[in-house]
């Protein structure tokens, strides 16, 4: 895509901070509250994760990251070798142009290179476009995990890396 770039950045990068504020406002609009999951820049440090910033003609329009998660962290639904997607977001003005799919593919590739075996994520019923993206990209429902695992609106999905999308 002409003008589209993806760059690894720290989670506390100023442009990421602005996008996180925007996605939190979107969560409030859809769910009545923001996402209280605690994330730190260290979660995405080299080898244990990555955080990507997508720009279109130099303007930040997308972000997303993965962090290493393993069974010994004691969380139901997690397995050794998991990479958890966090803060996947494309700004409204850039949606429906394939950027989320490009970002997702880059995150999956990065996780695979780092030796992660499965990508897991938590989303919700008020984000049907996200659920559709993940299902069409080979993700399937999995055991609930995370801060919102007891919420009826929570949906957890997983994809084994190295498998082509089904459908």
Task: Give short role names for the model-derived ranges.
Residues 87, 100-101, 124:
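Alpha-helical hinge/cap motifs
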Residues 91-93, 97, 125:
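Active-site acidic-Proline motif in GNAT/NAT acetyltransferases
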Residues 4, 8-13, 17, 117-120, ...:
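C-terminal "cap" of GNAT-fold acetyltransferases
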Residues 3-86, 91-92, 104-106, 110, ...:
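Acetyl-CoA-dependent GNAT
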Residues 97, 113-117:
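Short coil/turn segments at alpha/beta junctions that flank glycine-rich nucleotide-binding fingerprints
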Residues 97, 101, 105:
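Residues forming the Rossmann-fold NAD(P)(H) cofactor-binding site
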């Amino acid at each position: 895509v002409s003008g589209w770039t993806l760059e690894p950045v720290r989670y506390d990068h100023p442009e990421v901070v602005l996008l996180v504020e925007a996605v939190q406002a979107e969560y409030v609009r859809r769910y009545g509250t923001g996402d209280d999951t605690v994330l730190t820049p260290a979660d995405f440090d080299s080898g244990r994760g990555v955080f990507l910033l997508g720009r279109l003609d130099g303007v930040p329009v997308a972000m997303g990251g993965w962090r290493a998660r393993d069974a010994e962290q004691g969380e139901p639904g997690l397995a050794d070798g998991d990479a958890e997607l966090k803060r996947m977001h494309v700004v409204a003005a850039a949606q429906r142009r394939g950027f989320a799919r490009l970002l997702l593919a880059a995150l999956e590739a990065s996780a695979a290179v780092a030796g992660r075996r499965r990508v897991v994520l938590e989303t919700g019923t008020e984000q049907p476009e996200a659920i559709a993206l993940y299902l069409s990209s080979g993700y399937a429902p999995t055991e609930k995990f995370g801060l919102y695992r007891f919420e009826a609106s929570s949906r957890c999905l997983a994809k084994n890396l190295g498998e082509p999308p089904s459908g």
